[in-house]
Regions:
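Catalytic core of pol beta-like nucleotidyltransferases
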Residues: 1-32, 41-47, 57-106
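Short beta-strand->loop micro-motif that forms the acidic, two-metal-ion catalytic signature
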Residues: 52-54
């Protein structure tokens, strides 16, 4: 079995930009899209995925699951490597802090 090719950071960002174009209308352009994880930190390997945070100002809890599933379906239209995570600015988490500190705004 051949080892998969490691994307460059620029190649990963290009893929995430395509994804952002697809999802932006869902949030009326108000979502921040950040690439975080191995590609943003510069330590991606052949099995790395593109961790993508979709940060919205606010989302109703009853819409959270539905929106997360839709984001996953949208990511499959661009690349199976994209792993989206929905986040809200009003609900703090340690992951949110990490994304904001190390993520690359796309």
């Amino acid at each position: 079995m051949d080892t998969p090719k490691v994307l460059t950071r620029d190649e990963a960002i290009k893929i995430v930009r395509e994804y952002k174009k697809i999802i932006s209308p869902r949030f009326n352009g108000k979502a921040k899209v950040l690439m975080y994880g191995s590609y943003s930190k510069g330590n991606a390997n052949p099995w790395s995925d593109s961790d993508v945070a979709v940060v919205v100002p606010k989302i109703d809890e009853d819409k959270w699951l539905e929106t997360s599933v839709a984001l996953g379906n949208d990511s499959d239209k661009v690349s199976l490597l994209i792993e989206p995570v929905l986040m809200s600015e009003e609900h703090w988490s340690p992951l949110y802090d990490d994304v904001m500190q190390t993520g690359i705004m796309v």
